[in-house]
Amino acid sequence: MRILDWVVAGLLVLLHLVIHVGFGVGAAAPDLFTLALLVVARECHMALAAGLGWTLGLLEDAQGLLAFGAHGLALAIVGALAARSRELFVGDSLLFVASYLFLGKWLRDFVYWVAVGSGFRPPPVEALVVDAGLAALYMTLVGLAVVFVTGVLQGPRGVGS
């Protein structure tokens, strides 16, 4: 495992908390928890990625009052699938990284939408096409900037590298 990936993920988590909790920016800020999870999940085992996703999700859930555990479930599933993606997809091209980040964020929003319950969720077209699509695009652009600056998600992949 590369230390750089873990350092960048830790900084993304810290930045997420500062922006969302410290400054109270809310939905106008990118989802850096998901970005941090996607960066680290390609480097670790499925159980560790799911556990990290669950932990980050509980931190996210602690900031809100409704549907406690829905963020934890969503990030745990995304972390587990992202860790498995290392065995299914090999590559570090710009197209792959952009697709990986976009689909990871969109899947997180989809699982959250399903887990939150019908009483609290918006209509599917609004939530999954408009809101989740724009949020995934926003996080992908921020993620690509992080990739270019730090070099994470590039180079040799795998648990043994």
Give the ranges of each region predicted by the language model.
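Terminal, non-globular segments
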Residues: M1-S161
